[in-house]
Amino acid sequence: MATVYGIQLTNRLNTATVRRPLRLRRYDSCITTFTTPNGISQLYRALDFQPTSFQASILQTFPPLNAWSPSPQFVPDDLSLSQWKEWITERMRALATVLQRAHPLVANAGREVNPITIGLITSSFLNQRPIDGYLPFLFLARNARDPIAPLVTVDITFSDDTYVSRHVLYTPAGLKYLTLSSYDPTKPSSICTFGKHIPLYATAAFYPDETARLTILHRYNGGPPLIEHFDQPTYGPHVLIPALGSPEGYDTHLNICRLLLAEGLLDSFRLNASAGPSTAVARIDQTYHVVMNGSPDDHTQLATRLSNLSLLAVQGCQMTVQVADHPTMSDVGGFLVRLQGPGDPQRLIAYRTDQILIWQASPFPFGNNARYVRRPGRVPFTIGTTTYVPDTKTPLPFLPQYRQATVNKNNAQDSYELNVLPSLPIYSPFALTGGAFFQARDITGDPANVWPVNTLPGLPRDYFSIQSRQRRELLSRLRSHSDRSYVKDVHNISFASTVLNPVNNQIVLSEGFSMAYLGAASTHGTTDEPLIIEALKSGTVPGVPIPSKISQFGYDVANGSIMDATLAPPTGTFTFVYSDVDQVEDAGLSIVATNRAAVAVTNIALSMTTAGGLTVVKVNFPTPAFWTQLFRNHATDARALYILKPLIVNSVEVFLLFVSRATAGNLVSSPALRQFLVQLFDRSTSLSEVMAHVPLLGDVDTGVTTLGFNACRLYSPDLPTVNITPEIQTLAYQLATIVPSTSFIAREDYDGATAVTFYGKRTFLSRNRLDRLVDVPVPATNAINHQTRFTGSPVYQLFPTNPAPVTQLLWLARTTGLYTASWPRLLLSRWLICGTGPECRILSLMPPATSVTMIDSRPPAESLAAFNPAMNQYIVGNFLDPAQWVANPHDSLTAIFSLGAAFAGAGQDLVVGLTAFLRLIQPSNVQHLWLQLNTTLTSTASLPGLIEIDTRTGQYIFNGGQRTEPYAAPDAILAAIRLVYPAATTSWLTASSTMDWTEYVIGLGSSMSLDDVSTMISYSGLTPILHIDLTQRPMDVPVPLVVGVQAVIHVAAPVQQTTVIGSMAGVQVFTADGVNAPSTIGPLAVVWDPVLSRWDLTITPNQPGVLDVVVDHNGVLLNRGSTTIALPPATIVITFPQAANRDFTNAGNDAAVVCDAFYRLGVFVSVNGAFQPVNPERAAIVTAANARVLHYVYDLSDNHVLMYVCDITDNNIGRNVALPLADIFQTLFPNNTPLLASPPYPSASGRLMLNGQLFVDLDPLPPVLPPGVQIQALSTAIEPARQTAEVPGGAYTYVVV
């Protein structure tokens, strides 16, 4: 692709190949044309006809009307279309009559008309001039084809502007366009006429031979430029002598000659783009050639550029943009402006006055025309047509690619600063979308292990500072629009509906519960009540039964009662009280006042709750002062307490869920509460800090913030593929300052000049890459130059419309853990990156002074020549090749999302592949390894659509089958590592729920859905990173840690004056220094062993997870690795009584249950994949004689209802224990004793058949019961609301209906 004088040409050549010969018209055909009825004329065509108004402003003329050069009084620019039609129809009929008087039609019908003469006759007649002088020349002699020779045999004067002199016929050029009254040449959308609507725009000089032609040239030597069509000129050879001056609507420098040259050039480009061998054309070379008075070597002249570019058009060159059939004034003006822009001059073909050189490779067929001469040689074009791509409404993204060239950084920056766009108008859509990141924790506490309330964490120190408030407000504005109260209410109430009463394991919220909503307001969009109200009434909140009534109370209530929720209300009690009262409504930012209000609202909400019911209270600021009052005043008011946090924006507000309203509860402060609050406040701080990167709303981007846009604009840029131009330097520096994957190009037409804007996001990582660059890589511009489409204007949209997918969130979270937490404090200098990827993102992530060696099987897309070769190396190869490890010394290694694919490709399972890989690198003296491994670290459950765990084959199936990789258990992986590195310290890294990784999401200009956060954290637990540290002594865990079991951990330390710190999921859970040992994961005692120089920690863990341990030695953190705290064995054994000892009455049976005491157990049924509690009168886990037993009652529905004994952990049912009660399901019922019968599982009914006949329907029971059937006072049905009947002995068949 070439740019000639600012006009982009494709690398294809194409021309028409078949010429249409001159078709002479018969006399009768002319008469017919002249007498055509109004509206069906063959003499003209309206180019802009409006079918609604029947109007037009411009007409295209056809022979012989196109020979008319109107006298001033007959120019039709004051006529409408209808007036024109009427006038021309009348005049042409009159002309036909006059002609037939001189030459009767019958006698002359078949004679061929001289096309020049009939044109002159038409022009004179319409101008009301005599036509007698032309009539003798009307017809051509038989078999004569030359229309010129008969007219120029002798000198003659036909009129004052048409005459023959020295065998040359001079006559005004006819108008090819007629403009009517509504034509406005100053409007950009008007069709361009190239001046051919102006009378006397040019004089046509027809000549019969070369001698006569020379006469013309000599006559006008030194005058205006003379132009000529070389290829099959209309009716015969002629020279055009353009008039001087500029037509109205055009720039003053555009005279008639230049306009005619432009018309011919555009016509030629249009023909080249559409021509094919199946279509004949009147003229293949549509261009005009300047044959006298030109300046072919002065490339500053527009006419010279037009003439030289025309030479390329003759060869078959095509523009990259399509030429309209009838270009507008704007189109032509833009073309001429681009033509005068920068670009290479036309030097491929020499200009000759009387000839045109034709390339050997050109498809142009010149036949016997002596004006065209074949020129041998090679040219950078190929034969073919160009496919034109339509314009786009939006800018185009492009991926930067680079040449093997660089430019000086300072020079590139200088060029860039001349074209940079300052003060960009940033458009900031939403950084946060989706619903909420919801967390809930049981903080009921153990009276035997009370956490001191006064040591609970307070709010972040600068929470109320102007800067923190500004950042929280900014994030709130960048949250997608939704009714935030509704989102919170749905999460909170959905969770509350699943909570079980700790006394009987029954769901508290059953069908028909009553509810009070405190803080209800009428400020929810189009509705005058909280949106959750209607959703609850209609039953559309998942899992929540429909309440019998909902009462609303608050300051701004519309469908309830106005009430102050801090004062005792004159109301009854409710099963469920939900308070969304904001304490800041009255207290503002006064912590003391808000604490007082929160305690008061809690007191009122609990007082309105029925015994055994639920209470949810919002607390804006959960400070130690609030917790002190809560546990002092309400410790006995419920049997369990949960803390809920639906994260929607950055706030520290929480919701407290009081379970089973009571007067004898025992709520105490718990370690779980402290952990939750630490995590809550850490998350708030992280989300606040990340907003430091984001520019404020309502202001332009001045480049002050690390996140924003960089843009430069080039006008008709010269972007060669080989040379270095200032524009190339500008683009190179632009790409060096932004994230490559965010690059966009916008091409706009600015009155003919093409404005090309390059823009993309800058981030703190792009700045890191720029600092690492020694020179600036030169971009490859082939793809950019190929873009001929115009686009919409640049849109500086800071955050994308679609949130980052889970896998991208995970990568960004990994980046945070590695590049901001682990690596900087280790001060490592030489890195080897396995499977880095061709985009070389690591160069942006690592500090500029760090040496990086990258290995990947694919070639790099990054230009490594622009970086210091001593510190940045890229190896195309296989990192499983032993030769790579001998040649590349390093002290640190990473393999992120690389090993699984490599082992899968080699057909190895993970343990075998990992062992081989570690032995492979062992001789390289590596000190640190970060390996992403597929292992079920935090869960064994699949993630639908993301990771399917195939336990049979030991494979992870990613993204629905797109990729399959091996996985292994964590213990097997650690055993393989110890086999190669017995003294290695190993630490597992997963994404933290403190969301400290959002700096690499929002801070990099990505948006995220809060719905995906939980999924991403689970994903990271299935694909964690293992840090292998060969420089530190690992902690020793002689016996694996298990929840509830006391164990010892040995932690080496250089001296006693150190502190051991333990963390889980990014939250510190204990510190131990020999004096104090506060711990939220269970009782902890610590002793210093001076002989072995280690700390001996005795701990009884109270929660499962990955425990990370470090030693703080004078501010230097010494890694001691990770260890897993497992849940107790989830084995359960139930011993049922012998068949002979079964009791089929409602007295029930007892089966001994053996299971670890850690697990709280209950009996459930599975309904549509979800566990639901069983009526405790039917089956329940009870404690008798300090042992747990399953107490159950036999029922004829047992053969159709499979019950399960499940654990209830953190309000999750069946996560660890889900034992089907097959013994009960397979019961054989006797036929000689009364039996109990109830409906089966929910939403189904039962029917008893006896001897093949209906005995009784169980739901509903009939009004009249069969003999011997008795309704039981106490229901033992699966659902307690349904009835149980006792039936007499018999051989019943139970049917589910």
UniProtKB/Swiss-Prot annotation:
Keyword presence, Methyltransferase: yes
GO molecular-function term, one example from the UniProt record: ATP binding
Catalytic reaction equation(s): a 5'-end diphospho-ribonucleoside in mRNA + GTP + H(+) = a 5'-end (5'-triphosphoguanosine)-ribonucleoside in mRNA + diphosphate; a 5'-end (5'-triphosphoguanosine)-ribonucleoside in mRNA + S-adenosyl-L-methionine = a 5'-end (N(7)-methyl 5'-triphosphoguanosine)-ribonucleoside in mRNA + S-adenosyl-L-homocysteine
Keyword GTP-binding: yes
Gene3D superfamilies according to UniProt: Reovirus components, Reovirus core, Vaccinia Virus protein VP39
InterPro entries per record: Reovirus_L2, Reovirus_L2_4th, Reovirus_L2_7th, Reovirus_L2_8th, Reovirus_L2_GTase, Reovirus_L2_MT1, Reovirus_L2_MT2, Reovirus_L2_N
Pfam families per UniProt: Reovirus_L2_4th, Reovirus_L2_7th, Reovirus_L2_8th, Reovirus_L2_GTase, Reovirus_L2_MT1, Reovirus_L2_MT2, Reovirus_L2_N
Ranges that cross the membrane: none
Coiled-coil residue spans: none
EC numbers, comma separated: 2.7.7.50, 2.1.1.56
UniProt entry keywords in alphabetical sequence: ATP-binding, Capsid protein, GTP-binding, Methyltransferase, mRNA capping, mRNA processing, Multifunctional enzyme, Nucleotide-binding, Outer capsid protein, S-adenosyl-L-methionine, Transferase, Virion
One term under GO cellular component: viral outer capsid
Record localization: Virion
Annotated S-S bridges: none
Domain of life: Viruses
Function recorded in the entry: Outer capsid protein involved in mRNA capping. Catalyzes the last 3 enzymatic activities for formation of the 5' cap structure on the viral plus-strand transcripts, namely the RNA guanylyltransferase, RNA-7N- and RNA-2'O-methyltransferase activities.
Family recorded in the similarity comment: Belongs to the aquareoviridae outer capsid VP1 protein family.
Protein name: Outer capsid protein VP1
Organism: Aquareovirus A (isolate Chum salmon/Japan/CSRV/1981) (AQRV-A)
Name of the gene encoding the protein in the UniProt record: S1
